[in-house]
């Protein structure tokens, strides 16, 4: 049996011919080159992959693709690109940003979820083709997910929050800003399964009422950051329940919540000593 060396099998090392070996390849062992490549960004890795056959294998090794941010290429990223990346990276990938990638939809993200089950941080901010089907896939395959950004994914509904609650119990940060189909029922389902939430961004979720905040206050004692900007139906009553249940709160944004009065300041002072 050929032993693995940092995810690259010995047989793959043996494929390098003498004619393919530059001086640096002869001086440095393949294991060290692989380690060096692990510090490079996506663009540099792709350039290295074109240098030689040896570097192609090393640069494209899945262990080098644990953190990928494709925002700079958002106009060029289509579903097939995400599928190919997920197949190459597999279980190595921990963090992926597809922010602003309008061409990525549910089918590609299902393939991604199936292949990248160790994903911990995922940004789909502005991926407007994303629907509840994507959250169902994440729930089914990505139980290690900790941070999820679904801001401006306006097709997201309560069904997504229910799915995340059932399959992503480690979730600590969720951004569903401008997902204006979400109601108190979705929040109720979410917090019952994701009680470890530390940051929740609900900016522009205009259907949320005080009852949604009561669920958060009752089930999210670890909450540190809460953004309720322009949640127009929120009143003092709802925010007071947050103050009483979320004593670790450090950041609260209620800008544009016109039904809030000075009474909330007293509740914050008494119950949230860490507020900045």
UniProtKB/Swiss-Prot annotation:
The entry's note on the tissues where this protein occurs is: Widely expressed, with highest expression in skeletal muscle, heart and brain.
InterPro entries xref list: F-box_dom, Leu-rich_rpt, Leu-rich_rpt_Cys-con_subtyp, LRR_dom_sf
Q: Which residues form the F-box domain?
A: 22-68
Indicate the principal place this protein occupies in or around the cell: cytoplasm
Keywords, sorted A to Z: Cytoplasm, Leucine-rich repeat, Repeat, Ubl conjugation pathway
Which cellular compartments is it found in? Answer: Cytoplasm
Pfam entry (one): LRR_6
GO CC terms of this entry: cytoplasm; glutamatergic synapse; presynapse; Schaffer collateral - CA1 synapse; synapse
Enumerate the Gene Ontology biological process terms. behavioral fear response; regulation of protein catabolic process at presynapse, modulating synaptic transmission; regulation of synaptic vesicle exocytosis
> At which residues are the LRR repeats?
74-100, 101-126, 127-152, 153-178, 179-204, 205-230, 231-256, 257-276
- Which top-level group of life is the source organism from? Eukaryota
Function, as annotated = Substrate-recognition component of the SCF (SKP1-CUL1-F-box protein)-type E3 ubiquitin ligase complex. Role in neural transmission.
Write down the PANTHER family for this protein, in alphabetical order.
Answer: F-BOX PROTEIN YLR352W, PARTNER OF PAIRED, ISOFORM B-RELATED
Q: What does the subunit comment say?
A: Interacts with SKP1 and CUL1.
Supply the name of the protein. Answer: F-box/LRR-repeat protein 20
What organism does the record attribute this protein to? Rattus norvegicus (Rat)
* Record gene name: Fbxl20
């Amino acid at each position: 049996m050929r032993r693995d060396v940092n995810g690259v099998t010995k047989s793959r090392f043996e494929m390098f011919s003498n004619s393919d070996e530059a001086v640096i390849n002869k001086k440095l062992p393949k294991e060290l080159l692989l380690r060096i490549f692990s510090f490079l960004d996506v663009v540099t890795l792709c350039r290295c992959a074109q240098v030689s056959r040896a570097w192609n294998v090393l640069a494209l090794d899945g262990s080098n693709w644990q953190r990928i941010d494709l925002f700079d290429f958002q106009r060029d990223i289509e579903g097939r690109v995400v599928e190919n990346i997920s197949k190459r990276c597999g279980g190595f990938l921990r963090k992926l940003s597809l922010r602003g990638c309008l061409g990525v939809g549910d089918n590609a993200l299902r393939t991604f979820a199936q292949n990248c089950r160790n994903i911990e941080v995922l940004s789909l901010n502005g991926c407007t083709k994303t629907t509840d089907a994507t959250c169902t896939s994440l729930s089914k395959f990505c139980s290690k997910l900790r941070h999820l950004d679904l801001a401006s994914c306006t097709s997201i509904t309560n069904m997504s929050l229910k799915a995340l609650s059932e399959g992503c119990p480690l979730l600590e940060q969720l951004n569903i800003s401008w997902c204006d189909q979400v109601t108190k029922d979705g929040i109720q389902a979410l917090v019952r399964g994701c009680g470890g939430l530390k940051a929740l961004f609900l900016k522009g979720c205009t259907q949320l009422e005080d009852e949604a905040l009561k669920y958060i206050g009752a089930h999210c004692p670890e909450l540190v950051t809460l953004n309720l900007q322009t949640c127009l139906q929120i009143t003092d009553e709802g925010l007071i329940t947050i103050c009483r249940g979320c004593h670790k709160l450090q950041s609260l944004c209620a800008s544009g919540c016109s039904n809030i009065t000075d009474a909330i300041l007293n509740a914050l002072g008494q119950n949230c000593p860490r507020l900045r």
